[in-house]
């Protein structure tokens, strides 16, 4: 499965249609350093198993969609509103979900900001 296929699958599953221009992401900076210096960035990173990172009320959250799962049906939250290790469905947005403004799909020094539904209820 290539970058385009993965990206289109995520867009289709999440029901997203808005995609903005490409932006650079420098992997030489490193994952943790990038998160530390860009605390408000929401991103999906394909190189380490499709991670989702976002902030709510100043808190960073990281979640993983395993490679062998159906894309977008569930994710595991490691911190934040769902608690450590809880499963949260993102396939069907709940009425109480709000929309986080920007998300970024990161692959090979390129990132594509997209709209992403917020999983915290």
Swiss-Prot record:
PTM (free text): N-glycosylated.
Alphabetic keyword roster: Glycoprotein, Signal
Signal peptide (from-to): 1-23
Domain of life: Eukaryota
Entry annotated with the keyword Signal: yes
Glycosylation-annotated residues: 68, 84
Descriptive protein name: Uncharacterized protein YIL059C
The species this protein was found in: Saccharomyces cerevisiae (strain ATCC 204508 / S288c)
Lineage, opening ranks: Eukaryota, Fungi, Dikarya, Ascomycota, Saccharomycotina
């Amino acid at each position: 499965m290539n970058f385009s296929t993965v990206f289109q699958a995520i867009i289709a599953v999440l029901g997203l249609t808005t995609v903005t221009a490409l932006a650079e992401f420098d992997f030489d900076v490193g994952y943790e350093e990038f998160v530390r210096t860009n605390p408000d960035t929401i991103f999906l990173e394909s190189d380490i198993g499709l991670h989702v990172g976002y902030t709510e009320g100043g808190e960073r959250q990281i979640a993983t969609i395993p490679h062998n799962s159906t894309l977008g049906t569930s994710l595991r939250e490691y911190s934040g509103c769902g608690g450590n290790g809880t499963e949260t469905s993102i396939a069907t947005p709940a009425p109480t979900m709000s929309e986080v403004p920007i998300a970024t799909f990161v692959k090979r020094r390129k990132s594509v900001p997209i709209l992403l539904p917020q999983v915290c209820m």
